[in-house]
């Protein structure tokens, strides 16, 4: 159907960088069209396959416009078409005509209202500009409603030209209700019209173009065989495709707008729901098997994938759920996806599936696989069947093997490398290659992170045995905190601060600082109240624990234990830790810090294993000292009722506390150092950073607290806490850092001397007292073990003072090393 005879259309090309024919000056009087020209259609010149549009800026310079990008979708914007509806030619009409010419838009002008709809249905204009200044000559609002009545106008931008008025502005709601997109206050200036068109092109028109593209996306959703559901961040259902309705037995009208919680679910899966929510609330996808209830009450097993969608403000605005029913009626692909997904769910929930049900599932899958054996190789299906009964890592390897069969060669080779890594025993511990330029680092790694080489000569190293009982001291043990001598009380005045002087307390207590600092620290945290024990019982316990530290050790003595206890208490007082840990966690941390090196012989695990010591034999060369510290501490505690701080606890509380203490003491073993740090970074730091980027809202804070307070994450936090407390010497003020470096070096020197005397392997050759560079050893220790761990801990707890000390101390050791000095301090000037 053509346009009315009154509509005249002509087309011509605009020469590049050439002035428009008969272009009028940009005067306030407005432009005039050449005599007899009613319309102008000005197509942009475009070569075949051109991916950029061209328009001109105010100076006539060509401007490139990229294709429209809509998510992962890219499409080209055709030359825009503009329909001008003016009852007479005036300056405003001519201004828009010339602006269209300047912008390179096709322009059509019509004067008769009755011809507008027919013309629009023929051309499908992107922009319609209607003269709204003379209602008696042209009822613009009625015309707009008429256009909007056509479904084809859904994505059309309609602009109304209104008069400039001096009186008070009226509401534009009637204007919008009529169907107008926006209004334009009359201004015939060509540049004003041109700028308005550009704003429309890159604003409303571009947005409508994207909305129009959504039709193809919705078409795909509506015709998808997968059931798809979209909900808001508050879990209100916004969309459900026909496959979802068919699967669940609901109609769209029953679901749209309803809260997800109102839809019947299997209440027995509360733990699974918690797992799902904890995953998707931090922006991670979740996939697994989920049992839902249909409208008619039937249970249905689904392979569900839930994808959080980030929207405005970087926050999660929608959740997309893609659902497949695991009914085995169709293809082997669906079978494999269901089984693989079920595997993922097992890992997520951490629960064993019912053995009987599991075997039924295996038989069902095997039966279905027989029907489709021609579609998939038997080897793939055999691997997939085994997933339901194998260990998690085996399931992962099987899934990768199955994926390799249909992957191109580069992907297959990359997956081979992944499998090679997965088959190693230490997934979280980095592999260290020998560094020729850093023998100190090599020796530290070998000496602290291995159990040594077993000596086969038959010679055995026997630790000096002593009775595990209280050792007499030349100082008076206090009856209570109120009975502490004045000098010792003064030495403990600043125990709440990080720069607390532990060496002053050591001197005041004649090398027995643990009992005094322990009494004060435990009182501050209310440990006696939690354990339901008296202060005298706690005092006796601290006495027997301290008595079993070797005062002859330069480093691993009760002063080190008191220092670790102080650091632990300092960390526990930080706000993030107080919000995360429970009282029982605090008690476990303080007790673990107190006992973590009890009866330490002043030798490393590697030394004991190489020497064939009684402890190494007892603990099978695995975490020898750490196992001994924990076991002996509980033997000492429970062996005498007078010092048994656990005697009044409920059995379940005691078991939980004991487990927490042992876990923290074992975490101080350096062979697991990188495993603990990497797990903390991946499970705590990274998810926390993602959540905190979303802003500090009450809802977001609740998600953070829920994530941090899971038992698994609290365990990781406690391990990291005691690890950092145990090796915090490089983060102490410089004078204390130097003293600790002197003590640990002397202990290592003594071990090297004994290894040479007994003909044992020397596990740390650089710690030879005649040749060792203490600055180099400190630099290597900080580089390899301290920096990354404290960066992660600081990101979680916020410890600016410690990080400043660490930086200062590193610079100090670096300066000594650059001066080729091997001692603790520079020579006096």
Curated annotation (Swiss-Prot):
Its EC number is 3.1.4.53. The modification Phosphoserine is found at residues 20, 359, 386, 457. This is High affinity cAMP-specific and IBMX-insensitive 3',5'-cyclic phosphodiesterase 8A. Composed of a C-terminal catalytic domain containing two putative divalent metal sites and an N-terminal regulatory domain. Hydrolyzes the second messenger cAMP, which is a key regulator of many important physiological processes. May be involved in maintaining basal levels of the cyclic nucleotide and/or in the cAMP regulation of germ cell development. Binding to RAF1 reduces RAF1 'Ser-259' inhibitory-phosphorylation and stimulates RAF1-dependent EGF-activated ERK-signaling. Protects against cell death induced by hydrogen peroxide and staurosporine. Gene3D superfamilies: 3'5'-cyclic nucleotide phosphodiesterase, catalytic domain (1.10.1300.10), 3.40.50.2300, PAS domain (3.30.450.20). GO terms for cellular component: cytosol; extracellular exosome. Keywords: cAMP, Hydrolase, Metal-binding, Phosphoprotein. GO terms for biological process: cAMP catabolic process; cAMP-mediated signaling; cellular response to epidermal growth factor stimulus; positive regulation of ERK1 and ERK2 cascade; regulation of DNA-templated transcription. The modification Phosphotyrosine is found at residue 461. Coiled coil: none annotated. Inhibited by dipyridimole. Insensitive to selective PDE inhibitors including rolipram and zaprinast as well as to the non-selective inhibitor, IBMX. Unaffected by cGMP. Residues 287-329 form the PAC domain. Residues 213-283 form the PAS domain. It is an enzyme of class 3 (hydrolase). Pathway: Purine metabolism; 3',5'-cyclic AMP degradation; AMP from 3',5'-cyclic AMP: step 1/1. Residues 454-461 are annotated as: Involved in RAF1-binding. A divalent metal cation 1 binds at residues 560, 596-597, 726. A divalent metal cation 2 binds at residue 597. It catalyses: 3',5'-cyclic AMP + H2O = AMP + H(+). Expressed in most tissues except thymus and peripheral blood leukocytes. Highest levels in testis, ovary, small intestine and colon. Residues 480-820 form the PDEase domain. Residues 16-46, 341-360 are annotated as: Disordered. Its cofactor is a divalent metal cation. Pfam families: PAS, PDE8A_N, PDEase_I.
């Amino acid at each position: 159907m053509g346009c009315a005879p009154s509509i005249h259309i002509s087309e011509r090309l605009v020469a590049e960088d050439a002035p428009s024919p008969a272009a009028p000056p940009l005067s306030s009087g407005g432009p005039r069209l050449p005599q007899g020209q009613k319309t102008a259609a000005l197509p942009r010149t475009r070569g075949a396959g051109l991916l950029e549009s061209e328009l001109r800026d105010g100076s006539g310079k060509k401007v490139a416009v990229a294709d429209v990008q809509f998510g992962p979708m890219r499409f080209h914007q055709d030359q825009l078409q503009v329909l001008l509806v003016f009852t007479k030619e005036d300056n405003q009409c001519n201004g828009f005509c010339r602006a269209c010419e300047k912008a390179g838009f096709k322009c059509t002008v019509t004067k008769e209202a009755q011809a507008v709809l027919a013309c629009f249905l023929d051309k499908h204009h992107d922009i319609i500009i209607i003269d709204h200044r003379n209602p008696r000559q042209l009822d613009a609002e009625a015309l707009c409603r008429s256009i909007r009545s056509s479904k084809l106008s859904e994505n059309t931008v309609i602009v109304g030209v209104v008069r400039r008025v001096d009186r008070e502005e009226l509401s534009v709601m009637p204007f919008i209700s009529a169907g107008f997109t926006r209004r334009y206050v009359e201004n015939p200036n060509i540049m004003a019209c041109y700028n308005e068109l550009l704003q429309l092109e890159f604003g409303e028109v571009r947005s409508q173009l994207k909305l129009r593209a959504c039709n193809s996306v919705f078409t795909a959703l509506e015709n998808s065989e997968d059931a798809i559901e979209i909900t808001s961040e508050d879990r209100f259902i916004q969309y459900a495709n026909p496959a979802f309705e068919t699967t669940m037995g609901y109609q769209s009208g029953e679901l749209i707008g309803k809260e997800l919680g109102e839809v019947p679910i299997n209440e027995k899966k509360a733990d699974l729901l918690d797992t799902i929510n904890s995953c998707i609330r931090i922006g991670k996808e979740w996939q697994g098997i989920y049992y839902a209830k249909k409208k008619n009450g039937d249970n249905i097993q689904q392979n569900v994938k839930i994808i959080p969608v980030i929207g405005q403000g970087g926050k999660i605005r929608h959740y997309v759920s893609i659902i497949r029913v695991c009914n085995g009626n169709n293809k082997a692909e669906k079978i494999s996806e269901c089984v693989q997904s079920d595997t993922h769910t097992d890992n997520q929930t951490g629960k064993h599936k019912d053995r009987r049900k599991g075997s039924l599932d295996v038989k069902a899958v095997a039966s279905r696989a027989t029907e489709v054996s021609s579609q998939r190789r038997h080897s793939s299906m055999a691997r997939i069947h085994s997933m339901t009964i194998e260990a998690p890592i085996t399931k992962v390897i099987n899934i990768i093997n199955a994926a390799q069969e249909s992957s191109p060669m580069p992907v297959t080779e990359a997956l081979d490398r992944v499998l090679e890594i997965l088959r190693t025993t230490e997934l979280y511990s980095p592999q260290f290659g020998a560094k020729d330029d850093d023998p100190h680092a090599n020796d530290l790694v070998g000496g602290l992170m291995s159990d040594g080489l077993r000596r086969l000569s038959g010679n055995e190293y026997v630790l000096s045995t002593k009775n595990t009982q209280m050792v007499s001291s030349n100082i008076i043990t206090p009856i209570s905190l109120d009975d502490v001598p004045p000098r010792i009380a003064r030495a403990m005045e600043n125990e709440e601060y990080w720069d607390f002087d532990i060496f002053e307390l050591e001197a005041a207590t004649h090398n027995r600082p643990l009992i005094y600092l322990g009494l004060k620290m435990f009182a501050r945290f209310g440990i006696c109240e939690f354990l339901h024990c008296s202060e005298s019982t706690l005092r006796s316990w601290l006495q027997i624990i301290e008595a079993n530290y070797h005062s002859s050790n330069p480093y691993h003595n009760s002063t080190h234990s008191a220092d670790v206890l102080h650091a632990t208490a300092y960390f526990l007082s930080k706000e993030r830790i107080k919000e995360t840990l429970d009282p029982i966690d605090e008690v476990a941390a303080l007790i673990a810090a107190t006992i973590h090196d009890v009866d330490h012989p002043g030798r490393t695990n590697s030394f004991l294993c190489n020497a064939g010591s009684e402890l190494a034999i007892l603990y099978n060369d695995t975490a020898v000292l750490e196992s001994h510290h924990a076991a002996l501490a509980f033997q000492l505690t429970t062996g005498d009722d007078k010092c048994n701080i656990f005697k009044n606890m409920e059995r379940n509380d005691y078991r939980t506390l004991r487990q927490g203490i042992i876990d923290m003491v074992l975490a101080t073993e350096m062979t697991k150092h990188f495993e603990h740090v990497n797990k903390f970074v991946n499970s705590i730091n990274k998810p926390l950073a993602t959540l905190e980027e979303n802003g500090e809202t009450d809802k977001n804070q609740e998600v953070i607290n829920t994530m941090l307070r899971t038992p698994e994450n609290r365990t990781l936090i406690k391990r990291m806490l005691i690890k950092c407390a145990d090796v915090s010497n490089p983060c102490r003020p410089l004078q204390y850092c130097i003293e600790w470096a002197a003590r640990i070096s002397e202990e290592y020197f003594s071990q090297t001397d004994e290894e040479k005397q007994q003909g044992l392997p020397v596990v740390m050759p650089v710690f030879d007292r005649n040749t060792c560079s203490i600055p180099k050893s400190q630099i290597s220790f900080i580089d390899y073990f301290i920096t990354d761990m404290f960066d992660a801990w600081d990101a979680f707890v916020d410890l600016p003072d410690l990080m400043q000390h660490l930086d200062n101390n590193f610079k100090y050791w670096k300066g000594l090393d650059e001066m080729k000095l091997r001692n603790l301090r520079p020579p006096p000037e």
